[in-house]
């Protein structure tokens, strides 16, 4: 059996062919406009036409995803996917069985299948990028919620909200790499597109005052979110993914800031699979669905 896997991101569509034991034998990536759903569908069709020997399709998609029906009620930045049944569309196009799951849940499933969560019953995955997302594994089960919105950690308040625009005070608006870059651009008067997270952290290492202030606020925001999550779900482990985790000292710096919150007994580590987590988690979900229907 070969499974075609798709991981729909904000700037890229990752594609792969994966074997049932988790070996990725082919990968491909296409740059996309995160809001262009039709382009994403077209890229999927091209990849499937190039790989006609696959016997199933697994999809990791953003937004609120009903994995049973395949309906995406809200597709995040991809407005084309609002109230769109991607599972039915792919099945009609190919005649193949299709399984679809939320992208953050796929990252968690990859950790459960082939990562550090294999023997765990209570853990969280947190992804830090242009936004903050996550997945919840509690009492031995993936938690999706009544409307498939569980794990939207970025919508937690990071500070007391204002009356007129409460969303301004969420983690998504205060504690992401995009926000960090915007803040640095404002304080230095430089164009946002010139600034990278790597540059800000390099300046932090060089004891640049602006970078030190912003990075300290960044870590404090993450710790605030982790504090809330730990007391909500009591996980034994939290695994963090996203580009920030490529920084060798990230976990050590995060734990240093966590000390002031009095949290020491939850194990916090980087996630295992980096950019392949979405593909692997989607395939694991596909295999679970196939076994359930047998």
UniProtKB/Swiss-Prot annotation:
Gene3D superfamilies reported in the protein's UniProt record: 3.30.420.40
Matches recorded under Pfam families: ROK
Keywords: ATP-binding, Carbohydrate metabolism, Kinase, Nucleotide-binding, Transferase
SUPFAM superfamilies: Actin-like ATPase domain (SSF53067)
Enzyme Commission number(s) of this protein: 2.7.1.85
Family: Belongs to the ROK (NagC/XylR) family.
Protein name (database record): Beta-glucoside kinase
Gene from which this protein is expressed: bglK
